[in-house]
UniProtKB/Swiss-Prot annotation:
Post-translational changes noted in the entry: N-glycosylated probably on Asn-57.
Cited Pfam families: QVR
Superkingdom of origin: Eukaryota
GO cellular component: a single term: membrane raft
Organism: Drosophila yakuba
Name the record gives this protein: UPAR/Ly6 domain-containing protein qvr
Function of the protein: Bifunctional regulator of neuronal activity in the mushroom body, and possibly other regions of the brain, that acts as a signaling molecule required for homeostatic regulation of sleep under normal conditions and after sleep deprivation. Reduces neuronal excitability by enhancing Sh/shaker K(+) channel activity; possibly by stabilizing Sh/shaker to increase protein levels, accelerating its activation kinetics, slowing C-type inactivation and enhancing recovery from inactivation. Specifically affects the A-type K(+) current.
InterPro entries from the UniProt entry: QVR-like, Sleep_regulator
Keywords: Biological rhythms, Cell membrane, Disulfide bond, Glycoprotein, GPI-anchor, Lipoprotein, Membrane, Signal, Transmembrane, Transmembrane helix
Family from the record: Belongs to the quiver family.
Lipidation (GPI-anchor amidated asparagine): N127
Amino acid sequence: MWTQRNAVGNWLLVLTAVIGFLTFIWIPQTSAECQTRSIYCYECDSWTDARCKDPFNYTALPRDQPPLMTCNGCCVKMVRHQRSPYEVVRRMCTSQLQINLFMVDHVCMMESSGNGHMCFCEEDMCNSSKNLHTNGCQLHLIAIAVAVSWLMGQLLSR
């Protein structure tokens, strides 16, 4: 028998499904590739420039920091041989890499051995950070996914 409670539950279920679907369609499109505006990224390699090493001295005078380059993509920070005497840090712009950004999704990727990582970010000088974090779109997606899961659980428990 069709009741008002079933109608409201079904309406909420449909609304939740639509919001969830739109979120998974919209969010990847907004964050799938690096922004088109120019940003500044540090460009250095700790193998040849000690200023590039971690921890990065972002409070140093500009002349005592590695060079900044204009970037029409994302800033990148790569670390090899992490936490060892042979650690190498490289900071650059994605325009210097041949990589499919749709696969990267602006996160940190660990090297298969676990001894290194590559991180992407989209703000001026963001590749100076020791630990790069996920961008706002990813946090937004996680929050919506949690809300959708909670709503689905509430509806299915009736």
